Amino acid sequence: MQQTFIPVPLPQQPYQIAIASGGLTQLGSWLQDRSLQSVKLGQKVLVVSNPQIWKHYGEIVQDSLAQAGFQVEHFLLPAGERYKTPRSIQKIYDYALDLKLERSSTLVALGGGVIGDMTGFAAATWLRGINFVQVPTSLLAMVDASIGGKTGVNHPKGKNLIGAFYQPRLVLIDPDTLKTLASREFRAGMAEVIKYGVIWDLELFEVLEGCDRTNQYRYMPPHILTEILTRSAQAKADVVTQDEKEAGLRAILNYGHTIGHAIESLTGYRLFNHGEAVALGMVAAADIAVQLDWWSVEDAQRQHQLIQKTGLPTELPADFAIEAVADVLLTDKKVKDGKVRFILPTQLGKIDITDQVPGQVIVSALKGMIGQ
């Protein structure tokens, strides 16, 4: 089994990102490996997942943990962003109480970004913090949501407004789990991969440009997929290590997310999934950067073409409420002193942050995205 370990050397809780095809079978032994774990984990493990993911991978994960000597239980939540609520967290708490989970116990998130965010927040807050492990099964979660310790749930007024920074003990990425991922969800993850190419890793962007097909797993050569996963995870680890709690640099990881979150909110989290909204946010951010003379038209067009090639949306619906965007943007977590901070590219592989974006520039960018 080919294995890659990427360290995330945070001072309070360093951990490893393990990338390995077939790695689910090694989860139990890696959690017992003291070279990977700074503390000895307790026997009780609760795996949180959703029914679809559990059907495919639950038995493998449960067997791996049991064979390593853990006492394993599982708890299933419905799939989807609409269930990422405090009510779902309460259900995890209730089950944790039934199982008498202790501070040495471990919550394992087996699933996509929604499951990871909720499980992490439950781990951060149950008994003021218990062990937490990420086992992402979607591309988006593998390259973004599972790394860096952001956890939380949505509030009716905005996305991820309730949350905490809480680092996992291990992130296990098994590319084989992408075989059962819906094509639309694969494309959603590719939006985050494209983001890393724009903000951090020009070579990754060029690798993606060189791929004939970036829109489906089955068209992605295994060595290219491994390179994409490794480069994306390394980019996220590099940024998080320098700025764990988003005091400065880490904000660049929100490229495409400022307007993307507003699009998700204004369309009721139903029309676009998270990755699609991020893609639309990147299109808008590129237009804003060009209008402000921060970015060249040529580079913006390269990004646009890559997003289109990947099968991600670049247009908004004709009835999209542009006039409501300003109010939603003010609930964004990056707002500082009442000003919305935008992450904008200056060249491929480089990014900057500004709170000096005139409202008419934002409106112009969004109007240009309204579909025919």
Swiss-Prot record:
Q: Which Pfam families match?
A: DHQ_synthase (PF01761), DHQS_C (PF24621)
What's one GO-annotated cellular component? cytoplasm
Gene Ontology biological process: amino acid biosynthetic process; aromatic amino acid family biosynthetic process; chorismate biosynthetic process
State where Zn(2+) binds. 192, 257, 274
Keyword Metal-binding on this protein? yes
Kindly give the PANTHER family that the UniProt entry links to this protein. Answer: 3-DEHYDROQUINATE SYNTHASE, 3-DEHYDROQUINATE SYNTHASE, CHLOROPLASTIC
Role, per record: Catalyzes the conversion of 3-deoxy-D-arabino-heptulosonate 7-phosphate (DAHP) to dehydroquinate (DHQ).
Q: What is its EC number?
A: 4.2.3.4
Q: Which domain of life is it from?
A: Bacteria
Query: What is an example of a GO molecular function annotated in this UniProt entry?
Result: metal ion binding
Query: What's the family?
Result: Belongs to the sugar phosphate cyclases superfamily. Dehydroquinate synthase family.
Do you know which InterPro entries this protein is assigned to? Dehydroquinate_synthase (IPR050071), DHQ_synth_AroB (IPR016037), DHQ_synth_fam (IPR030963), DHQS/DOIS_N (IPR030960), DHQS_C (IPR056179)
Gene3D superfamilies linked to this entry: 3.40.50.1970, Dehydroquinate synthase-like - alpha domain
- What is the protein name for this chain? 3-dehydroquinate synthase
Q: Where in the cell is it found?
A: Cytoplasm
CDD domains with a match to the protein in the record:
DHQS
Pathways per UniProt: Metabolic intermediate biosynthesis; chorismate biosynthesis; chorismate from D-erythrose 4-phosphate and phosphoenolpyruvate: step 2/7
